[in-house]
Design a protein with these regions (language model features):
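P-loop NTP-binding core
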Residues: 1-93
């Protein structure tokens, strides 16, 4: 499954939903890649804090990727993970 969590407005919970969905799917035994497409990098930061605390299971994360690089990364990784979850940044806060 490839899932994008997005909204044009910032602060509506996109990152919270993306991170929690990634962790929930990982707890179900799925191999997950969370792509942090927001320049703020909050998804990556949340997963880093979780990993530093020793929380399992771990979730792979790719940092702030957008545009053609995002498309290329998804194409490259879609066969390596059960799910790819993309947290895209808001444009209108």
């Amino acid at each position: 499954m490839i899932l994008t969590v997005g909204n044009t407005k910032g602060g509506v919970g996109k990152t919270t939903l993306a991170v929690n969905l990634a962790v929930a799917r990982a707890l179900q035994g799925k191999e997950i890649l969370l792509i942090d497409g927001d320049r703020q990098g909050n998804s990556q930061m949340a997963l880093s804090i979780r990993a530093e605390g020793g929380r399992q299971p771990g979730v792979a994360c790719a940092a702030a990727v957008e545009g053609p690089a995002l498309r290329s990364l998804v194409q490259q990784m879609k066969g390596k993970f059960d799910d790819i979850i993309i947290d895209v940044g808001g444009r209108d806060s």
